[in-house]
Amino acid sequence: MATPAPEVLTRSQHARRSRVIEAAMQLAGEGGYDAVQMRDVAARAGVALGTVYRYFNSKDHLLASALLEWARGLEANMGARAMPAGETPVDRIVSVIRRITRASARDATLFAALVTAITAPDPSVSECQAEVQRIVAAVLSVPLHGIDDELREGTVRILAHVWFASLLGWVNGWTTSVNAVGDELEFAARLLLRGE
């Protein structure tokens, strides 16, 4: 069943959809991925279970949509700021990486649930993955303004891959904390931009 795109919803539908996402995020923050059950989401959001399924095909689609909303907020926050602090492209990208890592670490239980969902092999989740990837690329491109286009695009692409792999490692217990994700990203950025 196809779900309506957020941009074609009425104001009241958009408000209900937002309440559903907020309820899912609260449950995920309280108990992680397994704590998010669609019936509980509906009850917390104050909507019928059918309403939840009208907007989201599955729990993974719901949580992936929540991560997408989080990423959109991050993009808006980063876009509202001036060029990140730092004299060099490396310093600026490390500043951005550390800000994003701190934002992720504020609610590690929630963020782990969102990352778990975004990896699901669900076509609806794939749409969220593509948009999150676009946002990550946009956010990482800003601090690299002024360097060679090919180097910037390659650096952004590789950092996005390292970020995703590091997040998977963190969620699956291969690394100790979400801060370790930031460490790996910083190391990769310094390697890729050596001499810039």
Question: What name fits each language-model region?
Answer:
Residues 37, 109-115, 126-127, 178-179:
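Short, hydrophobic secondary-structure boundary micro-motifs
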Residues 65, 79-106, 182:
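Hydrophobic alpha-helical connector segments
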Residues 46-56:
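Short hydrophobic/aromatic patch on the recognition helix
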Residues 78-85, 114-121, 170-174:
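Secondary-structure edge/capping motif, primarily at the C-terminal ends of alpha-helices
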Residues 1-31, 35-44, 61:
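Basic, helix-initiating cap at the start of DNA-binding domains
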Residues 63-70, 118, 125-128:
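Alpha-helical DNA-contacting segments of helix-turn-helix folds
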Residues 101-123, 168-169:
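Amphipathic alpha-helical segments used for helix-helix packing
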